Amino acid sequence: MSPIGFNAKTGASGQVEKRLRAQGIELPEPSKPGADYVPFVRMGELLFLTGQLSQWNGERKFIGKVGREVSVDQARQAAKLCALNLLAHLRVALDGDLDRVLQCVRVGGFVNAAPDFADHSKVINGASELFLTVFGDAGKHTRVAVGVNGLPYNVSVEVEALFAVRG
């Protein structure tokens, strides 16, 4: 059984990169691990990506608790930024060929939330929507969106992902 949205490749390469350019989407430089871990691990067809923070080329963005210092709209942008960082690491893991993605399997989103904040899902939509834009049906995924009391460097959002890949 094929994954949801799986399309047999026609031999054309760079389709995902073309989609990125057509949408005006630029990827940041992949960040270096900030502690004793690796940015990704591959097990067979599964590629596990380490959680990425809301930063652009090393500069942290959207600092603070969502629902207090950071608005829902800003936090959605933070989640999208996390997803862009995930794509940058995914590109490295796949030797530059994002067309090797079969499916975005799972997204995990963590929101540095004020105690009374309850719109975690709206925040993580920023990441989910980017994966759908970039991969089409292959960007459909399962997901968890949870509120946490804090994140590294007090960023507002962290997102991790699991992809099925070929080759």
Residue positions per predicted region:
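Short, polar/acidic, helix-capping and beta-turn segments at strand->helix junctions
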Residues: S2-G167
